[in-house]
């Protein structure tokens, strides 16, 4: 798919299709009014007949509109003009792309980016249109023998901006949107892979492929032997029941000669059976998504490589598989972590934190500016926040605020939960320094409280994506989140000016 921006009048576009908005009740947008005027009232007469009300998602495809050079005009219902918000805008774009793909129009000029969206500017509208378009066209069908493809798919999309002085910001929005979309696609592809393909070695191979493609990226992979030498006994315990070797890939992006790195750590449980504390059979297939954190870090590193930002970033993919077996770790085991702290295992299905605690200890050697871990960590986060919002906890208020700001800018929402000292009491163990679970109350918070014991030397934030990393049901599959949030955070950290409020 090719994207571009231009500034021009709708009636002068020589295109397979021009896309304009119609508001409820049967009110033409300013651009649609221009087409109506040049067509001598042709469009408004259709609306008066009741062909289109303008409700959100309604579509009306017109052919050979009088006075218009374009072959087709697609009227898109946008709802009530004053109520057009971010969510509705993205839904409208998504429905528009689906419709265009079915019309046989291989290219189109879209004027929906001129609509007024509350609190959002041209940059945001163009970038979100790019990201939404790419997400809407995504499919994971490489294991299907019969692939359904449109007869004449949409190949080129031009977004119109109101003035020529906005062309530069529109081009920047496309570049940023394509980078985020690339990262999201990588994340979705890797996460959707079946666990008999995507094991820790596969994750590591994807990290190496990225390094092979860019001169300023290097990748190192640590296997179980080196982990043992480093004392990563907590990480290794989780891997003991599986025949697939645990591997931790460290991807280093160098965009600045001497800046301290931002470190992203992704939980990479390529399959989580629960171990000895085994999960129910129903829905266990979705535990291939327990590496969603690592997939999102890999995707973010791809987006970063596309953007070539002037910062240093290290992405860690903590790959592992949690399986039952004769050598698997057990409830009651006491583990000595890389930090030297001891952990009593009360539940082997609380394994993500046991992998992450050693990974978080390991990254201290990089003298990081900031560390952010990303993990499908707790079912409790789904109970608290559902499937729309990522859980955020942090030991540093400015970092938490940065991430919340990035989440709002990117449309990839997060919500901060508290991390008060009182929650630490739930992790007390009579036999070790701590237990690996803290009981049913505040499960997301106690999981983060556990991790916070290994992050005292640097500014740290934790993103719990258990509810947002994938969808179940008829839309089953990875969402690619929180790649947009993380990429926006890196854009902001690099000093790129990308959005101005209207």
UniProtKB/Swiss-Prot annotation:
Signal peptide: none annotated. GO terms for biological process: proteolysis. Mn(2+) 2 binds at residues 267, 272, 290, 351. GO terms for cellular component: cytoplasm. The active site is at 279, 353. Mn(2+) 1 binds at residues 272, 349, 351. Binds 2 manganese ions per subunit. Presumably involved in the processing and regular turnover of intracellular proteins. Catalyzes the removal of unsubstituted N-terminal amino acids from various peptides. Gene3D superfamilies: Leucine Aminopeptidase, subunit E, domain 1 (3.40.220.10), Zn peptidases (3.40.630.10). It holds the Pfam family Peptidase_M17_N. NCBIfam families: PRK00913.1-1, PRK00913.1-2, PRK00913.1-4, PRK00913.2-4. It is found in: Cytoplasm. The keyword Protease applies. InterPro entries: Leucine_aapep/pepB, Macro_dom-like, Peptidase_M17_C, Peptidase_M17_leu_NH2_pept, Peptidase_M17_N. It catalyses: Release of an N-terminal amino acid, Xaa-|-Yaa-, in which Xaa is preferably Leu, but may be other amino acids including Pro although not Arg or Lys, and Yaa may be Pro. Amino acid amides and methyl esters are also readily hydrolyzed, but rates on arylamides are exceedingly low; Release of an N-terminal amino acid, preferentially leucine, but not glutamic or aspartic acids. GO terms for molecular function: manganese ion binding; metalloaminopeptidase activity. Its cofactor is Mn(2+). The gene is pepA. Belongs to the peptidase M17 family. Its EC number is 3.4.11.1, 3.4.11.10. PROSITE patterns: CYTOSOL_AP. The lineage of its organism: Bacteria, Pseudomonadati, Pseudomonadota, Gammaproteobacteria, Aeromonadales. This is Probable cytosol aminopeptidase. Keywords: Aminopeptidase, Cytoplasm, Hydrolase, Manganese, Metal-binding, Protease.
